[in-house]
UniProtKB/Swiss-Prot annotation:
GO MF term list: identical protein binding; lipid-A-disaccharide synthase activity; phospholipid binding
Keywords (A to Z) from UniProt: Glycosyltransferase, Lipid A biosynthesis, Lipid biosynthesis, Lipid metabolism, Transferase
Classification via InterPro entries: Glyco_trans_19 (IPR003835)
Protein name: Lipid-A-disaccharide synthase
Family matches, as Pfam families: LpxB (PF02684)
GO biological process, one term: lipid A biosynthetic process
Job of this protein: Condensation of UDP-2,3-diacylglucosamine and 2,3-diacylglucosamine-1-phosphate to form lipid A disaccharide, a precursor of lipid A, a phosphorylated glycolipid that anchors the lipopolysaccharide to the outer membrane of the cell.
Gene assigned in the entry: lpxB
Protein family per UniProt: Belongs to the LpxB family.
């Protein structure tokens, strides 16, 4: 009598955020099926949970057109090899975690061979290049989406999608401890505090830092003792920000932080930030915010024609209205940014209303995403 093979799940993660999601999914699946086998492209966290890595995640973690072109032959070789090896292995389910440019084609290749496929983390198809939804529909049996409006978009096109909530919403408390965060950063409990988050990419820090610093200078006129915290994602961004500050606002005293973005948000009365995941994190930290964003004029012109949503920040997309002020392009200038931030720093009605809505939205997307994703995989594997 042949021994029944264990549940076999193939996974591909292409960057650190995907490695974190993959590790959480594997952990949740092992609770249900302790002897399951996990195999594919994995980072250190997934490997620590027991995933066999046929390739290291770093192989796929390339950014920017020039880098991708330089590595294209290798990336195509890896995808062809995975198509062949997964085809021979016949896993019960394949889970492509984010990395849509790599994974969606791979999912399509495997689906043609009768392998069930899941795409975990929806690309921003609801915002731009909406026709990608048809390719995703052909390539996958199921999309796992972090946000409810993403599921609504897929439903419109009859592409199977399951809203599982957001892992970040699971990780962050509904009621953060502001004073504890201030103690960590050395900020007095009774001070007014502003966080500046000019982005994680070099181009963003270059475009936004000067305006953000000038905004802080204006706010200091109203709040002379205003504490200003600036978390920067790495040494490179810190160096870049310090150079810009030396030119624009050499006398402005600020607390520069290495990482610690979440602590800075929790500790602050208001934040001025670039759009992106930081806006969602800031909402979950219950920190009132203003989104300021600039890009090169041609890029902005193009984006305006391609982007199909009314808002750029996730809190507004979740709320379905302008909950958070978005000041983009010409609007992203110190006078307007300062005017939008002043009522938030006052800690009055505006801030409290925003805080309450942030809490409601947090509850909506706090669904134990790892467990929800595991349930979806197990149901498809049957």
């Amino acid at each position: 009598m042949t021994e029944q093979r264990p549940l076999t799940i193939a996974l591909v993660a292409g960057e650190t955020s995907g490695d974190i999601l993959g590790a959480g999914l594997i952990r949740a699946l092992k609770e249900h099926v302790p002897n399951a086998r996990f195999v594919g492209v994995a980072g250190p966290r997934m490997q620590a949970e027991g995933c066999e890595a046929w390739y290291e995640m770093e192989e796929l973690a390339v950014m920017g057109i020039v880098e991708v072109l330089g590595r294209l032959r290798r990336l195509l070789h890896i995808r062809a090899d995975l198509t062949k090896r997964f085809g021979e292995l016949k896993p019960d389910v394949f889970v492509g975690i984010d990395a849509p440019d790599f994974n969606i084609t791979l999912e399509g290749n495997l689906k043609k061979q009768g392998i069930k496929t899941i795409h975990y983390v929806s690309p921003s198809v609801w915002a731009w290049r909406q026709k990608r939804v048809f390719k995703i529909g052909r390539a996958t049996d199921l999309v796992l989406a972090f946000l409810p409006f993403e599921k609504a978009f897929y439903d419109k096109y009859n592409v199977p999608c399951r809203f599982i909530g957001h892992t970040m919403a699971d990780a962050m408390p509904l009621d953060p401890d502001k004073n504890a965060a201030r103690d960590v950063l050395g900020i007095p409990h009774d001070a007014h505090c502003l966080a500046l988050l000019p982005g994680s990419r070099g181009a963003e820090v270059e475009m936004l830092s000067a305006d953000f610093l000038k905004t802080a200078q204006l706010l200091r006129q109203t709040y002379p003792d205003l504490e200003i915290v600036v978390p920067l994602v790495n040494a490179k961004r810190r160096e870049q920000f310090e150079r810009i500050k030396a030119e624009v606002a050499p006398d402005l005293s600020v607390h520069l932080l290495d990482g610690m973005g979440r602590e800075a948000m929790v500790a602050s009365d208001a934040a001025l930030l670039a759009s992106g995941t930081a806006a969602l994190e800031c909402m979950l930290a219950k920190c009132p915010m203003v989104v300021g964003y600039r890009m090169k004029p041609f890029t902005f012109w193009l984006a305006k024609r391609l982007v199909k949503t009314d808002y750029v920040s996730l809190p507004n997309l979740l709320a379905g209205r302008e909950l958070v002020k978005e000041l983009l392009q010409e609007e992203c200038e110190p006078q307007k940014l300062a005017a939008a931030l002043l009522p938030l720093l006052a800690n009055g009605k505006t801030s409290h209303a925003m805080h309450d809505t942030f809490r409601e939205l947090h509850q909506q997307i706090r669904c134990n995403a790892d467990e929800q994703a595991a349930q979806a995989v197990l149901e498809l594997a049957q």
